[in-house]
């Protein structure tokens, strides 16, 4: 079946046009297109058309913790949030450190069919940091794993990290680093600063992140490798990234929506929903991250969508599992922090939420231009809408959103994966 999107503005620019999607591709773009007899018509008058979003950093919890999330519920949240591809991190149970697990995740994603689910393979066996996994076998499997990370923990041994970068270069795959020097964060739950001191919480210094980013930039330089930095959170990290890029080092980085909007003032409530890794930092860090995203020092937005069940969050702060939901709120938070103040345009949103992450992960069919003949992986956005976040109403199996009861701008009105409508007007289209 073909789909006709009526009255939309590609990238939020120019006059309103109609976009006809047929056979999984953009077939026509122009004003007042004829409606095919079998077309599914989407009235998107005045809405913005963007390439489907790509999330380099999600936790779908399958296998092992399906009580918090699984690939079906996570895919639904992704589609409703405008995503057409997500990367599922390896810290599952069992760990995704072999083709048995990565191929299972891939096949489950294909079975659900709402987004392309790309499994991330572990860098080290069991995330233990001691022995490299068989990256080549995972890359050669059905999932064709193209990104590897021990996210949740840092590959802290510099020799192991150097070998991983060398190995990855030979395979043409990417290492994504959770930048945290573990010896600086023992027992830490909050950003090291006045707020943590006042609340009596052990502090997590910026240097724990910055030192690993600097080290891995140098290792990538010497190995001639690419390295990607997960969830940048500190102003100092921005300076290191800028220096590394100026040196010609092949380093990329992501920032989460929650680090763009929130800061450690939230911790005063001792609410476990605000515990996240890396921690919410000071307002000055959030300002630096926003500017870095606008300037291209930080390449993309990634959600670090991390569902946790109520019994894992509704506990004392130190006992709460770190992580926040992000897939359905990401666009709105980015609009509030970046578009509303004029730091990014809608075309820039396409760059940081679709084109750049697709390029980093080397996905040939995602993040493509809105042109005739291109794959119809598309997101339609109502830029003028507002909505109030209610965790219980989100598609995730968990409800641990830090944006509970917030009024946020912009809504996703439709998502198309290879021409198939996967989400429309807040509902999943199976």
Swiss-Prot record:
Enzyme class: hydrolase
Residues that, per the record, bind substrate: 59-61, 91, 277, 308, 322-323
Catalytic activity: (S)-dihydroorotate + H2O = N-carbamoyl-L-aspartate + H(+)
Pfam family, one: Amidohydro_1
Domain of life: Bacteria
BP-aspect Gene Ontology terms: 'de novo' UMP biosynthetic process; purine nucleobase catabolic process
Annotated Zn(2+) 2 binding sites: 151, 178, 231
Keyword Protein transport: no
Binding site for Zn(2+) 1: 57, 59, 151, 304
Entry EC no(s): 3.5.2.3
InterPro entries associated with the record: Amidohydro-rel, DHOase, DHOase/Allantoinase_Hydrolase, Dihydroorotase_CS, Metal-dep_hydrolase_composite, Metal_Hydrolase
A GO molecular-function descriptor: zinc ion binding
UniProt cofactor note: Binds 2 Zn(2+) ions per subunit.
Entry keywords, A to Z: Hydrolase, Metal-binding, Pyrimidine biosynthesis, Zinc
CDD domains: DHOase_IIa (cd01317)
Cofactor: Zn(2+)
Stored SUPFAM superfamilies: Composite domain of metallo-dependent hydrolases (SSF51338), Metallo-dependent hydrolases (SSF51556)
Pathway: Pyrimidine metabolism; UMP biosynthesis via de novo pathway; (S)-dihydroorotate from bicarbonate: step 3/3
Keyword Iron applies: no
HAMAP family cross-referenced by the UniProt entry: PyrC_classI_B
Protein name as catalogued: Dihydroorotase
Organism, scientific name: Mycobacterium bovis (strain ATCC BAA-935 / AF2122/97)
